[in-house]
């Protein structure tokens, strides 16, 4: 265990246990002879102080010994020693019962009787009921256990009384395959005994009929070996008698009636289901078996028959059997617990007493776990690993502490590795194939059980087995199990090894001479295989230590025997006792004692008279009073301390004052004693959420609590509050009621089931917002789609010549004839000619999209009458190429078509046939712009005029008349008409058109023969104004897109900033993340390429919550990953939280230590919010939300900055950072916020800090976040491109203005205070006050603070610090896990979209935004807001465009297509330039998902704006005028429940180092003018490792010094182990946990405090520090120098250059020489020298003086 802090009990009674005398070297022969002698005498052999050997057979196990006890040879002294160590040293013990041979009998039950504990009889009854499920007859053992490991875990108080007992299988479970499914086919083997008891004990005819059981040979599972009876050589073996005892035992543990019938039915069903396995089963037999099994198990036979394969049915048998065994164990533990509780209730000594020490809480317990490991391979691996592996467990601790550990030979090391490799899955080693194979099998079992479990009848016994808690799913193998490696790693291990004397089969052993069976070769083989001779030699010579103490603990334990303080005092006392020959060893940090020496000391202690008062070392507060203890242990402990909690041994200080609550004040309501037996090893967090049933007092049957609703309209709340509301809110409420007055409240109350007024009001607000959003969307859609048609009807029903040419496809065949456009797509393929010309594609294709006036000439005699009377008169074409295809010319009349076989022969063909037919294909007019008409007249000399918007062309007429010398036959039109064409060609002659007979008669001729089309009305202002408006918006949008594109271009080389030296807090809020995600995230922070000493991982676990898929609460997972010792139990300390009413009070536990990953060792702080005692029955005790986790850290740093009074939790955090980790919290300058499931790239932190260092105006910064599970599902794939482009377009653009509107909480960094004056930024009062708003009771606030806290925090920073910048840098990179399912994605985007809308409203209202009017960030924000709101309209419009294009119902939307192509084209350019080729595919997937992102998700989100958990503490029951009426159903929050105290006062009261004095305040008064807006500015509080920062106040020397040696306080190392494996038993003060980048300290350096800078006297020239970390000014490991690089800096200069011109060159030179005289020139850098000089001068040198400084440093170095 990581922290084996020893606490003694004064209730010990002596028992002598001397170390056995042994030869100088133990050989296999001497060991064999000794073991034989002990075997013959029936005695155990003690191999070393913690290991015993016994020899047992089934014969010796069934015979009574000299004491009349059965069960074989047992070492009762070993049990007694383990018990004494547990109760005297308050450390968990584990006794491992293992066997070297498979024939050895189990001694589990006999050993429990050997323990000096009162084991309740019900425990042995429970084992009687349990054994048949776990053991089977084999040829080599009549009762062979088929489990991996079975444990009995005793919880005992410090008096040694049993207060808890539970049985548990290990997580590896049972070998059902060997015990049931694959029994060997040879004789002598049976299945689990329980099945034979089932067949032998049918008690009633009704039971026999119901179960319908047959002979054992009828069942495939039992008939393989042909053995159905117990071994005949066992004198008392009878299945029927054993079955009766088995049933009686079941009843005794509460399995009776329906429960027992269900158990028996399940067993019978498994037997019958075995007949349905195998590939050779007949179909009829299979159906019959499934029918029977279905009836017994309450399962549809079709599920077994068709849904399960043969393999599935085998897996089902295995899974159901293990579930059944787990259930029996659960019932057994319940029975044991009930009997124990009854015993404790009737025992006055355990119910509490009034005397000192007589009152013991359930927390005052330690555990003794007896673990039975029947399989020799696993037992061997466990044993030899513990003895011979020097890199783990107690051996590693001893080695690190200076104990000489003899090296292990190569052969032994190979044996250990080989033994471990055989059972690596059982030992939790996940790297081998065995682990992966087991995981596959468990996954397969889970799959089959889920498939079957959901089909089982709801009220059936099997469903209760498989789904004990419906919401948790299948939990087989997860509930009620213990983890073997964790148990071994967190306890002191004792070994009890059983040896078998022969390989002979059991039936050959004689019952008359029990010890006659002895084969020296067989026993010798077992001794050699287990390396027991080497074991004895290794332990007895140097490593046989069974007790270890740290220095102070040892003195505190034995001070009454004359042991003096300090290392010298301890060594002297040991020498006085003669314990210098190996009986005791004083290591670097601990004292190690052999059993004989320890027991001698304990015996002497017992003989001493007891002191008048005995303190309970587990309690803290005013119960810790012991008048006889010395100054380091005899005074009351403060409430915030605990022996097992705080890692700094606060018992070593005289507490001069008590905690505030001792002087009166509000009563603490912290979680007190758990309501169940303390099982230990749970970090002091209790067992809530753990899947182990025996360890879970909060299971459903015990966790009922009243959660009724309070109806404020009919209920009786405690009191009513009235709070003022703003005018804006009043206007909004009035507006909402104006729009929703028609919806009666009673309808919402009874139909909508909204009983609360605030919920109804939120619904009304949501409805109004939805209506506004729909209105915006409707207006946009209407304006884009319909408004243009209203202004300009039929604009899509006209075509110009160019547009006509676009319709030239086979399925889009348009033509124009005499000014009209026709769609002849359905006509052109038809054979429409009655002449010999065939209609073919090649004939018709040339005419597609063309004007065909010349091919369809109207007969002049029909349409120009009375001017033309002869059919021979025709017009000649001015264009010689007018008729490219003469065959297509259509002339009607007998003159032009003399053939009578065609309809063209008829002169009326054009008007009677052609015009009616072509009219059916009419689409609209052919239009020409006025400019085109004019150009035809001026450039082409054509006679075009406009009359009443109609265009006529007389060019061919004039050409024909001129061709025939103006013969009247061809110049047939009146001259008054033709003169207008000649004189006004290209013009509009409407006003000149006369209403005369000539004009009227000419009109028909012009309309049919010379008509060209109409004037393009789409060029009119009414038709163009809408286009111009849309174009202007398009230009603006395109401009924004273009600017975003330009801002995203990063054409330069990737920057490689120099390593930075700022102190950074990595804030990690943890909620429900899984273990893999948490481990990956924490590992990534640890591996950051940043100075390990300058980063702190600050994890805040938001409540005791079990995430989906987890088997324990998130805090336990985090602490397990970080390697915290499960026995560490810090106190729960009060703090203020975000919440309503009493929820403003919360309690938290603080853990600290070092975490190692890939050679990086980083300090961490873990704060677990555990909640008030009244919350412990709730599902989420302590949970207050992510915002509260952020506020907790921000408020702490704010109080550190202002040196303001802190809460007890904050004081403990300060203490852990300042005194344990060794860094003044005020040194931290940045806060990196990272989600727990986010992995950060190694160089990201350095890049973020470098960017902030280069630009002091940056207050917040973020990098790129991508997906780490991009290919996990379709839902993750559609998010990849969105994540990428949202950063490289949106955030890159906003970063240009220094106004990133959302710094994502999953990966961003904030500056804590300004670089120049130290003005607080994110930790300022103004930001915290608004961000910590408790009254989140409106829809707007809910969306701001409950959904989008990260975005709103950025908004607040922008609001209060508009002059600062908020940047995005693409070089910093992190990856996070995106939602993998639709439901999770829907929930996430609901939060994101709604919070975006509400936050953008806030941002748009901010003052001091850069730019003005359309050239401002405000305009961009409004565009983003509108763009977010109208996302559905965008999607609808795109769908509309696709429909129009696909259906050919409108013109091709060229502009829209160009814009879309531009948008995605520019985006493509970005990732192509960045060589992110994969995003081509991701972009395509994203486009395919466009309707999801822009329609489904937004609409769902908008409608779900009021989907919150509203709580029932504070209910808004109405808003009247300028008041909000609130009903409060809560006891309220008493601020006195969180006492506040300044750190200096607290440190002084508790004699702690690190007091900082009033330097900051005195400096403020001295220099004045350094405070703005009540924000403390401290430009002198910077990292003293920064290159150019003023001297830190912590180097100036404060009052209250403790003299040369300072305080006697010696903060110990964090209990967290060096390796991040659970249960690693690192020493309490192990130097394994030092930083890897710091050399080992030697000698006296390893015995002193971490040394906070502020506690050192000015003149001190030498420093001592512990092996954990050097003091903060000595992290580089140079003990003898006097600078911050290698030791303590001199006090700051007495001169002050503020307000003057700064130091002159002489002062600079003098400072350089002084610094160079102090530092180690072999290791110091020029940068460090420059920092030291500036620190000494208390100023930052700039310009010429900076140049002089650099030059002078070089000069001084050259002259040295």
Swiss-Prot record:
Record's signal peptide: none
Query: According to the UniProt record, what class of enzyme is this?
Result: transferase
The entry annotates sugar attachment on: 275, 878, 906, 995, 1394, 1584, 1652
Its catalytic activity? [(1->4)-N-acetyl-beta-D-glucosaminyl](n) + UDP-N-acetyl-alpha-D-glucosamine = [(1->4)-N-acetyl-beta-D-glucosaminyl](n+1) + UDP + H(+)
Q: What happens when the gene is disrupted?
A: Reduces drastically spore production.
**What Enzyme Commission number(s) apply to this enzyme?**
2.4.1.16
Q: Which UniProt keywords apply?
A: Actin-binding, Cell membrane, Glycoprotein, Glycosyltransferase, Membrane, Motor protein, Myosin, Transferase, Transmembrane, Transmembrane helix
Its annotated compartments are: Cell membrane; Cell septum; Cell tip
Q: Where are the transmembrane segments?
A: 731-751, 767-787, 1029-1049, 1419-1439, 1452-1472, 1480-1500
Annotated GO CC locations: cell septum; cell tip; myosin complex; plasma membrane
UniProt xrefs under Pfam families: Chitin_synth_2, Cyt-b5, DEK_C, Myosin_head
Residue ranges of domain Myosin motor in the record: 1-374
User: Which GO-annotated molecular functions does the record name?
Assistant: actin binding; ATP binding; chitin synthase activity; cytoskeletal motor activity
Q: Where is this region: Actin-binding?
A: 374
Q: What is known of its domains?
A: The N-terminal myosin motor-like domain (MMD) does not seem to have motor activity but is indispensable for polarized cell wall synthesis via binding to actin that ensures the proper localization to the hyphal tips and septation sites near actin structures.
For this chain, the family text in UniProt reads: In the N-terminal section; belongs to the TRAFAC class myosin-kinesin ATPase superfamily. Myosin family. In the C-terminal section; belongs to the chitin synthase family. Class V subfamily.
Name of this chain's protein: Chitin synthase csmB
What is the native source organism of this protein? Aspergillus niger (strain ATCC MYA-4892 / CBS 513.88 / FGSC A1513)
